[in-house]
Amino acid sequence: MYPKFKATKYALLVLIVSVISFPFLQGEKYPSFNLEGTDGKQYHQIQFKEKEFICIILYSNHCKISQSFEGLIKEISEHLVSENSILLLVSPNNENALLPDELAYSDVGDSIKEMRIRSKDRNFEFPYLYDGLEQSISNQLSAKSTPHAFLFNKTRNLVYSGRIGDYNEPNNLKKSDLYQTYRSARNSAQINQVVTKVHGTAIKTKEDIFIANEVRRRYSEESVNIRSINQQTLKFFLKYNLGKTTLFYLWSAKDESSRENLLILSETFKIFRKRGLKLFTINVDKDQKETKLQLEKAQLSASNFILPGNEISPLVRYIPNNTTRVTPLTLLFSKEQQTLVSKIGAIDSLMLKRLILKDLKTSNIKNGRY
């Protein structure tokens, strides 16, 4: 049906296989770069010439394995800084090449703007550099996935290439291959190169944008259906559809934030639906044609309903007390049927994603891929 997309299946398979790889030391040298950091500064390789050791870690915001090592990365950085060395965190992904459901384990993507959010939230005190346009560092180092750590000594010879630490104990400094190699290299004049297998998610480049665009096009062609329900049907949905992380959105096309909210919900649903998120939109307008048009513009192929405004009483108890408005109402229920969000007005996309993630509970990092 989609000949161009079918032609890319082999390429997609290669991407999936490459996330578990054994890096080879091919005489890689300390890479040259000129990259922007999350602090707005430009970073060049020669400005670290006085440092004894330089550690470069390729990391992805969206990669759950990268995330699991954040605490250890910070701890290793503290040791390096105290000994006139430095750790550079580098994001090599082109954010436009990510598929929606590849973001299902993260509150943010891999753009420089989202890197700033992650850096601030996690209190990164080391340079966090964006290399998503050209992958200059990962290309020079022949890296294929994140996380991937590289360690260079005073003469800028590569002494380590591989994983950050033990995947089963990602916060254990004693089991960190990277840190133990650093300690050994500091205490030895001999260059002993260490290589370990890396396990993570494939680096996304501009060559992968075509696949991502094809997937987005297929999403845009999904059918958007809408049907009328009554109060009894709404009660049924509220009673029997709250066993999973569930969103309800009560809205009117007249709402000031209607269009933006629908776009946020559409994006959020595409990201998390494969992990089990359920979404019900309920419109209180009488114009079914206009309602469907708004949903189609937002490409919102969830469970969409129209319900007369005088039959929304099952939802009234969830409306915040400090408002006289009924729409737009966003409700997020946990798996245990607790109300996580009950808000009138504009949707806070970042806050919503974080609450959804917390309820979905990230699966064991040993799964590797998702």
Annotate the PLM regions.
Residues I57-C63, Y249-D255:
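Aromatic-flanked redox-active Cys/Sec active sites in thiol-based oxidoreductases
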Residues F22-I54, S68, Y105-V108, R163-T246, ...:
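Non-globular targeting/processing and membrane-anchoring segments
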Residues A11-I20:
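Bacterial N-terminal signal peptides
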Residues R122-F124, L133-S176, L300, L307-L357:
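Thiol/disulfide oxidoreductase modules built on the thioredoxin-like
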Residues S68-D121, E134-I137, R259-Q299, E311-R317:
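Structural microenvironment flanking redox-active thiols in thiol-disulfide oxidoreductases
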Residues Y2-L12:
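Bacterial N-terminal signal peptides that target proteins for export
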Residues E36, P127-G132, R227-N230, S303-P308:
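Short acidic-hydrophobic, aromatic-tinged amphipathic segments that line or gate anion-handling sites
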Residues C55-I56, L87, L247-F248, L279:
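Hydrophobic beta-strand anchors of alpha/beta hydrolase catalytic cores
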